[in-house]
């Protein structure tokens, strides 16, 4: 343009394609396998329990590590919820406690904190051991628990994307849609297939 060879910028209307993130999470079979394995070492059992707890709450490591009894409240529905502030954004959030998460809290309720205290580095190191013992061929990190909560626990059980977005603490639903686009598409495909079979009858 500056040299006078062309009048308009040919890239002005060009919009790059969005890159769909590939997310790693545990399938329902892998999660079941993890939940039911008997560990001989207490440290691995504790980290497994903490990981599973996050699979059913979606808590990031920062929130999990400071969770105390004051964060557990009985709400309008008579059920227990986690009520606290995100360390990253300082936004308040609430997550209803599913039965499996409650059972893990009850297991460790004698502790000063609701869950054992393990550093983030050791946590991920122990997860690597756990994956090798159980035979999960994925690089297990704490972050995968949050992804598992969003996908295997919520989306694959037909929880609406709006609710998933709220429970993950996303400020915009578009953030959730971008992160979990492939999962949502797969669910839409499954539901349309089910609808097609019903309409064919």
Model-predicted segments: where are they?
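Basic, Lys/Arg- and aromatic-enriched nucleic-acid-binding interface segment
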Residues: 6-61, 79
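Conserved tyrosine-mediated DNA breakage-rejoining catalytic core shared by Y-recombinases
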Residues: 15, 30, 66-104
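Amphipathic, well-packed alpha-helical segments that form the structural scaffold of globular domains
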Residues: 15, 35-39, 65, 102, ...
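C-terminal catalytic core of Y-nucleophile DNA break-rejoin enzymes
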Residues: 20, 86-129, 135
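Catalytic-site neighborhood detector that most strongly recognizes the C-terminal catalytic loop/helix
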Residues: 25, 86-90, 168-193
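Short, basic (Lys/Arg/His-rich) helix/loop patches that form interaction surfaces
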Residues: 41, 109-113, 117, 125-166
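C-terminal catalytic core of tyrosine-transesterase DNA break-rejoin enzymes
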Residues: 52, 56, 62-63, 146-171, ...
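C-terminal secondary-structure termini that scaffold catalytic or DNA-interacting sites
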Residues: 194-201
